[in-house]
Swiss-Prot record, chain B:
Belongs to the GAMAD family. The modification N-acetylalanine is found at A2. It comes from the Eukaryota. It comes from Bos taurus. GO terms for molecular function: dynein intermediate chain binding. One of its GO terms (cellular component) is cytoplasmic dynein complex. The lineage of its organism: Eukaryota, Metazoa, Chordata, Craniata, Vertebrata. Its main location: cytoplasm. Keywords: Acetylation, Cytoplasm, Cytoskeleton, Dynein, Microtubule, Motor protein, Transport. This is Dynein light chain roadblock-type 2. Pfam families: Robl_LC7. The keyword Transcription regulation does not apply.
């Protein structure tokens, strides 16, 4: 490369180097180029001295190197003047050079090792001879060694390696390196750009919560199921229909008002709002347990909860009640009329306890509903029986009335879907019992005991039967036509009966065989007759329907829901049944008596306990008094007289009362003795004013209660008025008789007495009106009473 | 449709109810019985709160869902019933 470069430089120097051109131009003076300088002869003869130097004319003369020491570029004085004209790399190396020596050495070694190898392999005789020429020159050694080498080639190779290694350590490059590099042609780079319109963008943000993931999966599942279904029902017609339907639905969605979708939420809100309004009732329903039951000696009360009524059903009586078997807060009320002369439309309302202000479902019909029932397995099916003999089935799932009319032979009475009742006799499909004197209103089997059933009738009685026995086991006289009876679902001995005077009676045979443990008026006005009663399957409440179309919900107090104690080895459910059987057997010994006990039995506790009186109650008692007066009466009954009077009063609520009273002239003391049945012993103490007398009554329980008797006389002689107001030391008012001092109530008594006086004998017949006012909140018994 | 209207009317005329409103999924009130500014305020705030409550309930168990939300304050009670697309808000003064 360098030689070529030098050659080139020499050739090119003609045009390039400045001095060279001038010299060449001058040597060729004979030929005159057109651009030759025109010089004078004198100038031509001028001698110029030229000095030949050994300097390389091509060497650069002003090499400048950067000196780091001084920090500037410095001119280098010495320039290499060497000019290489030709160079070639040869393959001969001088003997004395390092490389030469090494090679020589190597050759000698090779020769020596071959000899030693020869010694080993071949006969040991040759060893000395071989070793001798070993130290000789390589050439001689190599000649003799050649045949030896060929013979023992393989072995020598191995031997060669081992002696070589300790002496020669440096391995030189045996190859002739020459570095070559080449540069490829660099293609020129070019930038090419292209810009398009950016795609439309939107911002999207979302959260990835647990439930979003879940929702996405559920959607996927639904889609898959839909596609599966579509595949199954694949016909062109179906497709078309599907499309049409799709179109319709989308159309509807866009058209319909948004409001319909709020149905569910609106329902929930309505219930919440009602819950707020009736919060206390809801709390009572859930949690209130009447604590006073402990003091009440096994009697219980009914706590009124909600009242369900609807304007549309206001005039219609409740003719049927039924709880839904699946949803325990839903019940159905059938409305119609029991007045067989006046028959109008009917209504079926379904209420939920969660919303007492408006029914969940409303159905109306042309004819009054007489009875209804709900399907056990399909709780959305309600069957109703109409007055006109038709039977209709309503499907609650569909909003419209769906009847399945079937006219029946009976022209609407209480058609219980199971039983048929006739007017004069209660008849089973198997048997006939001579039960009641009047219409039988309801019959019901005991839910636990399969033999026992009961019936109620307008002849004021409730009878409990064993179907194998012709005579009833128990008879209860409730003083008023009984509208309905129902067994309690939680105990086989508890049942409820409702009467037309607005009272509900609850009986528990295991506690008290003869009397109700609760009888309580539950409707506001006495005119309301209660028509039906139903127990809720799980909650301790009953619903009571009356003939005004109102349904009242009442909670049973703890005493009414006593479960019989579990005996070992016996199921609770069968327990009461066994008990009943026992009672049954007991009664069978004495089966002649109808076992109806009068309410005024000596052992029985005071009946007025356990009843929630209406705010006021009046009773009228007939009082016959005979008085013997020392002085014929001129001005009523004067305290200064001795009088003896005997009075006998009879009232529907009172005990027969015989009272003997003696007034002694000092007027300070009067003794009155009452026959024990009135539980009262009165001692009269007549006081100062002629028309005022003070009486102290002594109650059976030996408590003293002052009571004030006010006597007044009217103008008409035979008539005198006496009023009595009694004051109890506990601050409340009580009356010594006829109710006894068991309750502290405000009692006013006005009695009108007609006296027939004949000389000293005076006969008075009087009607007393006792007004008993209930002071609310004063349920606890008076300490004095 | 008439049923829902009736139900809403009944709710509005119930004892103690101050106002009712229906809000859609974006928090825009659709129907209201209160004045505009109050409605907008309630709608915006309760929408957010309901979303948060719903998210909370479902985060704990995705198969669960919010049924309703009651906020009882000193003066009255706000009840919210969420639906798939709508929110029904009722403000009531419980009679106590």
């Amino acid at each position: 490369m360098a030689s070529r470069a030098a050659r080139k430089r020499d050739e090119d120097s003609v045009t390039e180097v400045g001095e060279g051109t001038d010299e060449w131009a001058q040597s060729k003076a004979t030929v005159r180029p057109p651009d030759q300088l025109e010089l004078t002869d004198a100038e031509l003869k001028e001698e110029f001295t030229r000095i030949l130097t050994a300097n390389n004319p091509h060497a650069p003369q002003n090499i400048v190197r950067y000196s780091f020491k001084e920090g500037t570029y410095k001119l280098i004085g010495f320039v290499n003047q060497l000019a290489v004209h030709y160079s070639q790399v040869g393959n001969l190396i001088p003997k004395d050079s390092d490389e030469g020596r090494r090679q020589h050495y190597r050759n000698e070694l090779v020769a020596g090792s071959q000899e030693s190898a020869k010694v080993v392999v071949s006969e040991p005789d040759l060893l000395e001879e071989e070793e001798g020429p070993k130290e000789a020159e390589a050439e001689t050694g190599s000649q003799t060694d050649v045949p030896a080498a060929e013979a023992a080639e393989k072995v020598t190779e191995e031997e060669l390696i081992t002696p070589k290694q300790p002496k020669e350590q440096k391995l030189t490059n045996q190859f002739n390196f020459s570095e070559r590099a080449s540069q490829t042609f660099n293609n020129p780079l070019r930038d090419r750009e292209c810009q398009m319109e950016p795609p439309p963008r939107t911002n999207f943000s979302a959260t990835a919560n647990q439930w979003e993931i879940y929702d996405a999966y559920v959607e996927e599942l639904e889609k898959q199921e839909k596609t599966k279904e579509k595949e199954k029902t694949k016909t062109p017609v179906a497709k078309k229909m599907g499309k049409m339907a799709m179109r319709k639905t989308t159309f509807l969605e866009s058209q319909s008002d948004d409001i319909t979708k709020v149905t569910q939420a609106a329902k929930i809100i309505e219930r919440m709002v009602n819950q707020n309004t009736y919060d206390d009732i809801a709390q009572d329903f859930k949690y209130y347990e009447d604590a006073a039951d402990e003091y009440r000696d096994q009697e219980g009360t009914l706590l009124p909860l909600w009242k369900f009524q609807n304007d549309k059903a206001k005039r219609l009586a409740v003719t049927a009640l039924c709880w839904n078997p699946k949803y325990k807060d839903l019940f159905a009320v059938g409305h119609g009329s029991y007045d067989f002369m006046k028959q109008s439309r009917g209504m079926l309302l379904l209420y939920s306890m969660k919303n007492p202000s408006f029914p969940e479902y409303i159905f109306s019909s042309d004819s009054g509903i007489m009875c209804l029932d709900m399907h056990v397995d399909h709780p959305y099916l309600v069957v109703v029986g109409h007055y006109d003999g038709n039977v209709a089935i309503y499907n609650l799932k569909k909003p419209h009335f769906q009847p399945a009319f079937r006219s029946s032979a009976k022209s609407g009475k209480h058609t219980d879907p199971v039983w048929q009742c006739s007017k004069s006799y209660s008849s089973q499909f198997l048997d006939t019992y001579d039960a009641h004197n009047m219409a039988v209103d309801a019959v019901s089997w005991n839910p636990y005991h399969t033999k026992v059933f009961m019936s109620c009738s307008s002849d004021w009685t409730v009878k409990i039967w064993d179907h194998t026995i012709k005579t009833p086991m128990f008879i209860y006289d409730l003083n008023s036509a009984v509208g309905d009876v129902a067994w309690a679902p939680y105990s086989s001995t508890v049942f409820a009966a409702v009467t037309t005077d607005g009272k509900t009676h609850i009986f528990d045979l295991s506690i008290n065989k003869y009397e109700a443990i609760c009888n309580q008026p539950v409707v506001a006005k006495k005119k309301n007759k209660i028509t039906h009663v139903q127990f809720n399957p799980i909650h301790p409440i009953i619903i009571v329907g009356d003939d005004r179309g109102h349904v009242t919900c009442l909670k049973l107090s703890p005493n009414l829901r006593k479960m019989p104690k579990e005996k070992k080895g016996q199921e609770v459910q069968k327990g009461p049944a066994v008990e009943i059987a026992k009672l049954d057997k007991l009664l069978n010994l004495d089966s002649s008596q109808p076992a109806s006990q009068p309410r005024r039995s000596p052992e029985a506790p005071a009946h007025t306990e356990g009843t929630l009186w209406k705010p006021w109650q009046a009773c009228v008692s007939l009082c016959i008094q005979a008085m013997y007066l020392r002085v014929p009466p001129s001005v009523g009954l004067s305290p200064a007289q001795v009088c003896l009077f005997v009075s006998y009063s009879v009232s529907p609520f009172a005990f027969p009362d015989v009272c003997l009273c003696l007034c002694i002239p000092p007027c300070l003391l009067a003794v009155s003795v009452c026959v024990p049945i009135s539980e009262c012993l009165s001692i009269f103490c007549v006081s100062l004013s002629p028309s005022l007398s003070l009486c102290i009554s002594l109650h059976q329980s030996l408590c003293l209660t002052p009571c004030l008797w006010v006597y007044g006389s009217l103008l008409f002689l035979p008539v005198f008025l006496h009023g009595c107001v009694s004051l109890c030391p506990c601050g409340r008012l009580s009356l010594p008789s006829p109710w006894g001092l068991c309750r502290c109530l405000r009692l006013f008594c006005v009695s009108l007495c007609v006296c027939l006086a004949a000389r000293r004998l005076c006969l008075c017949v009087g009607l007393s009106l006792y007004l008993r006012l209930w002071v609310s909140g004063s349920q606890s018994p008076c300490l004095w009473g | 449709m008439a049923e829902v209207e009736e139900t809403l009317k009944r709710i509005q005329s119930h004892k103690g109810v101050i106002g009712t409103m229906v809000v859609n999924a974006e928090g825009i009130p659709i129907r209201t019985t209160l004045d505009n500014s109050t409605t907008v305020q309630y709608a915006g705030l309760l929408h957010q709160l309901t979303m948060k409550a719903k998210s909370t309930v479902r985060d704990i168990d995705p198969q669960n869902d919010l049924t309703f939300l009651r906020i009882r304050s000193k003066k009255h009670e706000i009840m919210v019933a969420p639906d798939k697309e709508y929110l029904l808000i009722v403000i009531q003064n419980p009679c106590e």
